[in-house]
Amino acid sequence: MYQDLDDPIEVIAVFSDHQLRPVRFKWNNRVHKVSRVTGSWKKLEGEYIIRYFAVVDEETNVFQLTYNERLTDWVLSKVWVE
């Protein structure tokens, strides 16, 4: 099941071919390298877009990262816990 969070994170992301893709992020003083993005979607909030990314790190942990274009910030919004 997922645990809902709203933790600010630092993200290194690549923007190419009109696509934004997170590459790694820092959460709780630990760097997680994204091994794959399993899904991405966006939601319009007023005039701004909120982008969501379901990602898996190198240790097969599953996270949902959220990028707010208006605030230009990232948060860790969900983490898979067993």
Where are these regions (language model features)?
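Cysteine-centric segments in proteins
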Residues: 1-82
